[in-house]
């Protein structure tokens, strides 16, 4: 019944987790109030969560046959830092409790320890000092002086909505095809949706997403995971900017065509320069990478696949090297040309303030524009009829 829930293990786990986050948030707020270096707090918070995660993964219920401290530490570090590297086979080593610990570490790492703890501090403890709010505003790349809490809510809201939508589509794509019951399918869908959006690349399948259970006739699964990786890799400021633009355009169209009032909302351009650069560069890298990989691997690594599967695998393998660690084809089966292309894609990475790595597409775009300006002898670096500041160019170089 209802009251029995308060005596269940799940209730105690959730309660202890919330209390731990509140205590950590309170500690971070006190440190910020002392003008402590936010970068030092950021690094220390990651280290604390890594050590806690490693300790939890060594618990008897987290694994089937036990795990060494080095393997637990490596797995926890990889999960928090969303790299996707593992020293043990995830599917045969960790129990459902262990997988839950891993996915929570991935979620914390994907959102950012500081983002998560700052949200708890502001939401449950009220407004903090102006200095603390400015630090948080800078941390989440908010351009306005409105409450950082609203920006943090945007980030958490976007994360939950996108991951829930991804979970639903993944569930539909695998339902009744992998020999799992409903609970296992839901757990599989939730794990891979979070892992994809956070760009972690962890999978519960042996051999990652190259497992024979999903390699063929699961194009929707690969496409869904690819788009989750892309959304997580473009960065939260881009997602917020896109939301604001879509919200504005929806209101404008509503007033114009439903209320027949053309003067109510004036049309303006809300896409900022950063959003345009990231979206255009992402599209260029995806299209170029997909076409190149399909051409290189048509009769090589993709031999035996249908035409549709080849293009889906090309898109998937052009998406994941930049930001995530998923794999659907063994790396040893790829041609040298594809491996070199993947090295370049990994180096470029995703957008700033995202879950992706690399030098970032923003930086890569500025470097290329600066190089072009030098080659043609231009005094200024322009893009979309706007001049890039010398400070932006200096930091990118």
Residue ranges of model-derived segments:
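Membrane-proximal intracellular helices of multi-pass ion channels
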Residues: 1-397
């Amino acid at each position: 019944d209802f009251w029995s829930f308060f005596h269940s293990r799940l209730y105690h786990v959730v309660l202890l987790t919330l209390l731990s986050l509140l205590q950590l948030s309170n500690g971070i707020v006190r440190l910020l109030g002392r003008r402590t270096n936010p970068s030092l707090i950021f690094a220390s918070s990651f280290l604390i969560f890594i050590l806690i995660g490693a300790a939890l993964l060594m618990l008897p219920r987290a694994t089937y046959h036990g795990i060494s401290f080095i393997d637990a530490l490596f797995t926890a570090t990889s999960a928090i830092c969303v790299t996707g590297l593992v020293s043990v086979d995830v599917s045969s080593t960790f129990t459902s409790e262990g997988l839950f610990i891993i996915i929570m570490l991935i979620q914390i790492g994907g959102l950012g320890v500081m983002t998560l703890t700052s949200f708890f501090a502001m939401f449950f403890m009220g407004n903090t000092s102006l200095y603390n709010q400015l630090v948080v505003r800078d941390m989440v790349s908010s351009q306005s002086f409105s409450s950082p809490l609203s920006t943090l809510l945007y980030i958490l809201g976007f994360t939950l909505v996108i991951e829930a939508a991804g979970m639903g589509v993944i569930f539909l794509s695998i339902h009744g095809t992998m020999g799992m019951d409903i609970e296992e399918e839901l757990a599989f869908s939730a794990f891979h949706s979070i892992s994809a959006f956070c760009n972690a690349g962890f999978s519960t399948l042996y051999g990652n997403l190259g497992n024979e259970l999903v390699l063929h006739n699961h194009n929707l699964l690969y496409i869904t995971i690819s788009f989750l990786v892309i959304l997580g890799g473009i960065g939260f400021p881009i997602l917020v900017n896109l939301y604001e633009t879509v919200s504005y355009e929806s209101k404008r169209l509503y007033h114009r065509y439903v209320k027949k009032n053309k003067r109510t909302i004036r049309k303006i351009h809300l896409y900022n320069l950063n959003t345009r650069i990231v979206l255009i560069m992402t599209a260029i890298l995806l299209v170029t990478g997909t076409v190149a990989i399909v051409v290189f691997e048509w009769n090589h690594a993709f031999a035996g696949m249908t035409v549709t599967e080849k293009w889906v695998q090309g898109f998937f393998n052009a998406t994941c090297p930049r930001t995530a660690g998923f794999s659907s084809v063994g790396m040893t089966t790829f041609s040298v040309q594809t491996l070199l292309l993947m090295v370049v894609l990994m180096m470029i990475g995703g957008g700033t303030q995202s879950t992706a790595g690399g030098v970032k597409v923003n930086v890569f775009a500025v470097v290329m524009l600066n190089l072009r300006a030098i080659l043609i002898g231009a005094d200024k670096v322009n893009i979309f009829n706007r001049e890039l500041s010398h400070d932006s160019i200096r930091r990118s170089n």
